[in-house]
Amino acid sequence: MAHLPVSPEKLIEQFGPHLNYPPREGFAGRDEPDKAVKTHCCFCGMQCGIKLLVKNDKVVGFDPWEEFPFNQGRLCPKGVQRYMQNNHPDRILQPLQRNEGVGFTPVSWDEAMDKTVAEIKRIQEKYGKNAFSVLSGVSLTNEKSYLMGKFARVALKTANLDYNGRLCMVSAGAGNKKAFGLDRTSNTYADLEKAEVIIVAGANISETFPTLTHWVWRARDHGAKLIVVDPRVIPLARTADLHLPVKPGTDSALYGAILKYLADHDMLDHDFIDNHTTDFDKALAAVKDYTLEWAEEITGIEKAKIELAAQWWGKAKTSFLLHARGIEHHSKGVDNVLGCINIVLATGRIGKPYCGYGTITGQGNGQGGREHGHKCDQLPGNRDITNPEHRKYIAGVWGIDEKDMPGKGYTAYELIEAIHRGEVKGLLSICFNPLVSLPNNNYVREALEKLEFYVCIDFFMNETARHADIILAGSLQEEEEGTVTTAEGRVVRIRKAVNPPGHARSDTSIILELAKRLGAEDKFTYRNSEELFNELRVASKGGTADYYGITYQKIEDTMGVFWPCPTLDHPGTPRLWEDKKFATPDGKAHFNPVTYRDPGEITDEEYPIILTTGRVVSQYLSGTQTRRIGKLVDLYPEPKLEIHPELARKYGIKQNELVQVSTRRGTDEFPANIVETIRTDTVFLPYHWPGKKSANQFTPATLDPVSKIPEFKVCACNLKPLGVISPPSTASGAYASI
């Protein structure tokens, strides 16, 4: 039903992506703006401070916001181009309806809303409430994240709600809650500055979080040793004291061996372990056979390097461990996270100045968006939807009977499987491009084609939206008031700079109108985002992610408040666990036993090479926004297959030669980029592109049993040179790949 109404080429011609560039002389009004609005960048969890320059209700440029304490005016390539979206020619300016053989045609808001509500009611009356589903996104503000969770459960009354954080931070979140009872980085990044040893595991921060690199350099200036764990020699690794080129999928073996080494050489904080933790004996028993020799065989890292890393970590007085998707995008991502946490707890270096642990959030509101209830298993305040007391409390805040609160629904990829089985017939998506972001995306496309009705809220027509029946023209971050939460746990203000262009509306107003037409108006009476936030504060009160003491005014006065902040007179909590009282029922941090197991997909004779995926500096997630910005596309026009010279020689592959990549799920071709900065048994593709240039046409849908995150980082493949040299990337048009 939700097939493309016309060819992809015609849709691209009509709605893009098209590239836009600023005029050489800058946009009119850049030098004499009406106002400079202090807000934040939308492109990663750092949420760097930035000033947007506005003239005649249009964003015409930016200035650095040097006073904001995290980035202090610094911006990455994406940050300096983020202002190019507001006036982009691809903006959706009015509601659109599928028109077979034509594409999409404009309709009035009443027509679009009437059609959407009628289809929701039809599907739910015919198949049941859970037959209609919602996929949300964590680039939404805290207010909109909260609103989407409430809308799905109160207005739609469906259990089937999930979000694209399921593809990002959920393994870290599950590990943090198991170990600490709370899901947040333990310290501000300023604590990095005087750490003696820093481990950066599976986090290409120089390209994906460039402004964070500053704090690592500050530590290096003070003599810190830097250890980088990554199968590639990422830019940060080129300057590191020690690079551990781990074989993709073997991270838990590395951290298990380090834990055993720390114990064997008595590099432990016995007082901390004895008085403030549990289950150290179980964690140690799980790794009793994890010798350095065994770890070398499993991980491919020389045992001398593993030993040196363990010695540096064990002997340090202060340390910081950071990780991101490189260890989390696995079918054992939660285990990898817990393996890292175990070596932090073993040395007792948490809850102290310059000692910390944290996961780096990749999406624009990756931290706040995973706290307030648009996950299938979560209620606001990071509460558990299966916990009777949690359900009762939130039902009271929402003014509904607890028995009317839906239960746990499907996670993002499970939802796609449910569509295939015919359980789910309708979908509303916002801020999510699953056709590019989910693994095995040909299967995802087939699911979209089985839907009876699909409505999308977005400001650009992304690849998934091309399958929609109705598209509702939504808003950019700077077109609404709100808050987001940085990767440090700092709640900051998003300030409205301009109105949505044309007949586009704010995301919030769209959802409120849908709720009204679905008969739930009395539960959605917010007049502005601050009223939404104030209800969120109450809903979070007493939860582990407690925002109750945070107000818009307090944020204005301080440039951000760190949660938990349980009372109005509480200053916030920049550094967790200083009192050694953890958020677990017994008040202690919990070690967790982690045993190594193979990835969900292993290499064999037919598919002997490991394919891993990741990001590049100029692109963001599925590329919906960044593949439309000319200067960002110029930096990296199309995905290339990174391959080591030794592996290239083995297969007879030349630089820029087209290479056929084959996996158990599909085959396509990419130009080769021969580099020495990758393991000899591994190739790399960035995942920001759709269609024939998509890395996720190859990735398996093997899910972590706890977090349900897909295994994006390990895929078995084979290579075949095609004997054709690829044309220059700038001429390829891959940014608009079908």
Mark where each language-model region is.
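N-terminal leader/propeptide and maturation segments of large enzyme subunits in energy/redox metabolism
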Residues: 99-106, 265-303, 380-404, 498-573, ...
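N-terminal export/assembly segments and adjacent metallocofactor-ligating motifs
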Residues: 1-267, 302, 388, 397-405, ...
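Catalytic-core regions built around general acid/base machinery
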Residues: 212-222, 440-451
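A glycine-rich, hydrophobic/aromatic-adjacent loop/helix-cap motif
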Residues: 314-417, 488, 522, 568-572, ...
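Long, contiguous, secondary-structure-rich segments that constitute the structural scaffold
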Residues: 3-4, 8, 12-14, 501, ...
